[in-house]
Amino acid sequence: HSHDHGSADHLAIEGFTSLSFSSSQPFDLRAFQNFLDNHLPESVFRAKGILWFKESERRHVFHLAGKRFSIDDSDWKGARKNQLVLIGRDLDHDQLRHQLQDCVVVSVD
């Protein structure tokens, strides 16, 4: 008889990954909203971070759980930057990083 050494629970836990993203340029607010609304995979169940939007002078604290998210603003202390962590199952890190990078404003100096 054969038995499987990998229990389902074990595999489920291993499937969870976290992706960190940071940038020293701000996000475009519309692009980021579009990412959340249309491109965020179902498999992302938790996200949090500090967001910098070019449209705002404020620092934005972002929390996502399931399909619900909140963004609270406050004053910046220190250098402005984006720092975001996504947690989910079997995430395509390269694709997500690419999509987030697409939300970053490229400076037009």
Language-model-detected regions and their locations in the chain:
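C-terminal accessory "lid"/substrate-recognition subdomains
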Residues: 1-77, 82, 89-109
